[in-house]
Amino acid sequence: MILETKKRNKNEESIPNKTTSNLNLKIKKMSKNIILSNQEIEHTIKRIAYQIYETFVEEDEIVIAGITANGFIFAQKITEALKNISPLKVSLCEVKMNKQNPELPIHTSLTKEQYTNKGLVLVDDVLNSGTTLIYAVRHFLDVPLKKFKTAVLVNRNHKKYPVKADFKGISLSTSSLEHVQVVFDEKGDSYAYLS
């Protein structure tokens, strides 16, 4: 009888369940140095959306341009928040560029005509050295814009280029050896961490 109970317990332990996978995710997150929780990211998105609306309140239409991957996801979230709080017509644009080699051509999901003479906010998740952001800024300077601003979730103070974020979630003074990563999770478990 005791033997059967042990076998049953061994079988139960080997079957992963939802609780076990959630626990594993929490353990992985705990081993990282979390700097922004999901709730803090959601609050930051709303705050930045209000700041953008205040800046562009006299415009009828603006473009939110997010740099591929996390910058674009962050831009989508800001766009959604802006649509909920303002009457502005908000267009979303994906900025496709090679972050390892930013000198390569940059492509956008909108044509130049679609953002010419409009207000534009360029969005990325983390402003590290400023390389990605400055090359993306340069791309948009080829056309006249009414206003041009930048937004980042995390602003680090180790820039190589004279570029700044007009709207930022948090600013960090870290060593140049530390890296900031942002994880956007569709299940509502997004976070930013220092590694």
Residue positions per predicted region:
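PRPP-associated nucleotide enzymes
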Residues: M1-E12, P16-S195
